[in-house]
């Protein structure tokens, strides 16, 4: 950084503390060809909580025919909440589940009613239309409309909502993407009620 005479460097206001999260149980296993046993997923989730992680992404409530790795989403969530090892710690841990489409959100709402649903769900848009349609099956316009409908429903069920913006640096289908779209989508998430934002480069 080169400063010219008379210029001042902007002060960066770093937070005094951060909260560490882990997404291995969901993202780490998502593309594994073989099904990871529920016992193994539960063990890892418990160990991560015992290690001190306060935010954990544990599963995807999407269509198990499309995402067979997460056909145990309900069972894993039930067992985690009933865990003798970490059940008493869950009040201080935020559990997140992926919910790309409507049915996934409805499943988490049902799970909340039964006492084992996540604390937070995650929606995802891409700055690339092609990537977004491949990921969700909807156009960006239709997806935003869906989220505007389902964010209030999630809040009514007691869940926080994360709005993720993907392909902020580039798209495997379209190539380079415009960063201004990521900024625009971030603002849009906040405008429609998302509680927090994640940015992803995939």
Features from the language model and the residues they span:
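Conserved, mostly hydrophobic/aromatic
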Residues: 28, 48, 108, 121, ...
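Short, Lys/Arg-enriched N-terminal segments with co-localized hydrophobic residues
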Residues: 1-8
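Glycine-rich, proline-tolerant flexible connector loops at the mouths of alpha/beta enzymes
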Residues: 54-80, 123-138, 169-173, 196-202
């Amino acid at each position: 950084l080169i400063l010219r005479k008379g210029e001042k460097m902007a002060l960066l206001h770093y937070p005094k503390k951060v909260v560490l999260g882990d997404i291995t149980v969901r993202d780490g296993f998502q593309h594994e060809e073989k099904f990871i046993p529920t016992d193994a997923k539960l063990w890892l989730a418990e160990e991560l909580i015992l290690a001190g992680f306060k935010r954990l992404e544990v599963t995807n409530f999407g269509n198990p025919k499309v995402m067979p790795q997460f056909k145990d989403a309900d069972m894993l969530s039930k067992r985690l909440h009933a865990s003798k090892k970490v059940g008493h710690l869950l009040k201080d841990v935020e559990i997140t589940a992926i919910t790309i489409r409507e049915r996934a959100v409805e499943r988490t709402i049902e799970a909340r009613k039964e006492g084992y649903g996540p604390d937070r769900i995650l929606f995802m848009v891409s700055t690339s239309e092609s990537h977004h349609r491949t990921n969700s099956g909807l156009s960006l316009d239709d997806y935003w409309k869906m989220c505007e409908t389902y964010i209030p429903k999630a809040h009514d069920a007691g869940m926080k909502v994360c709005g993720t913006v993907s392909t902020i640096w580039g798209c495997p289908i379209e190539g380079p993407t415009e960063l201004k779209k990521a900024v625009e989508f971030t603002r849009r998430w906040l405008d429609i009620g998302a509680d927090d934002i994640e940015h992803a480069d995939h």
